[in-house]
């Protein structure tokens, strides 16, 4: 599998470890940087990973910053990207199986490298399980990426809220 990986300067060593791990598992890696500890900005590298995945140059992506929050938010701004900030295998698997996530984000200063590798393995092994319900959710989320007059409609999510009120969702 071809995987794009990017980070900011705070977690360069963690990214290098992820790149090395992925290569050791037989994956091809597009290393989107950064490559050293010189001060930089996470949106640059979130965008690079997102563009690699959205364009099809990479099948999936991994982004890492100190907490994971900034770079995951940045990569989510790239049209066609559904990224999830994850800290456990359950969230990573859910993000792929239910939301068809194509990028996962980590807080490299929050989570250890061995756990990060396990979570990446779980994410890569998981497969999207399309249902009519999650297809609608994904379509709704994807529509938020573009200027869309429907977003100004106060009833944009009514269909889903009505189902909630009827008790159709079960956790």
Swiss-Prot record:
Enzyme Commission number(s) of this protein: 5.3.1.26
UniProt keyword annotations, A-Z: Isomerase, Lactose metabolism
GO biological process, one term: pentose-phosphate shunt, non-oxidative branch
Pfam families hit by this protein: LacAB_rpiB
This protein's record includes keyword Disulfide bond: no
GO molecular function: galactose-6-phosphate isomerase activity; ribose-5-phosphate isomerase activity
Pathway: Carbohydrate metabolism; D-galactose 6-phosphate degradation; D-tagatose 6-phosphate from D-galactose 6-phosphate: step 1/1
InterPro entries (alphabetical): LacB, RpiB_LacA_LacB, RpiB_LacA_LacB_sf
Catalysis performed (reactions): aldehydo-D-galactose 6-phosphate = keto-D-tagatose 6-phosphate
UniProt family annotation: Belongs to the LacAB/RpiB family.
Known partners and oligomeric status: Heteromultimeric protein consisting of LacA and LacB.
PANTHER family: DNA DAMAGE-REPAIR_TOLERATION PROTEIN DRT102, RIBOSE-5-PHOSPHATE ISOMERASE B
NCBIfam families assigned: PRK05571.1, PRK08622.1, rpiB_lacA_lacB
Database matches in HAMAP family: LacB
Protein name: Galactose-6-phosphate isomerase subunit LacB 2
Organism: Streptococcus pyogenes serotype M6 (strain ATCC BAA-946 / MGAS10394)
């Amino acid at each position: 599998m071809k995987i794009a990986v990017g980070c900011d300067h705070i977690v360069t060593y963690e990214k290098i470890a992820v790149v090395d791990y992925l290569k050791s598992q037989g994956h091809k890696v597009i290393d989107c940087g950064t490559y050293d500890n010189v001060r930089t900005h996470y949106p640059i590298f979130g965008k690079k990973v997102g563009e690699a995945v959205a364009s099809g140059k990479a099948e999936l992506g991994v982004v890492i910053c100190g907490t994971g929050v900034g770079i995951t938010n940045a990569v989510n701004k790239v049209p066609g990207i559904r990224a999830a900030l994850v800290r456990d295998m359950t969230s990573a698997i859910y993000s792929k199986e239910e939301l068809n996530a194509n990028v996962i984000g980590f807080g490299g200063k929050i989570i250890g490298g061995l756990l990060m590798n396990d979570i990446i393995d779980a994410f890569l092994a998981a497969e999207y399980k399309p249902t009519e319900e999650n297809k609608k959710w994904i379509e709704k989320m994807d529509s938020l990426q573009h200027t869309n007059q429907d977003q100004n409609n106060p009833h944009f999510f009514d269909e889903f809220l009505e189902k909630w009120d009827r008790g159709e969702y079960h956790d």
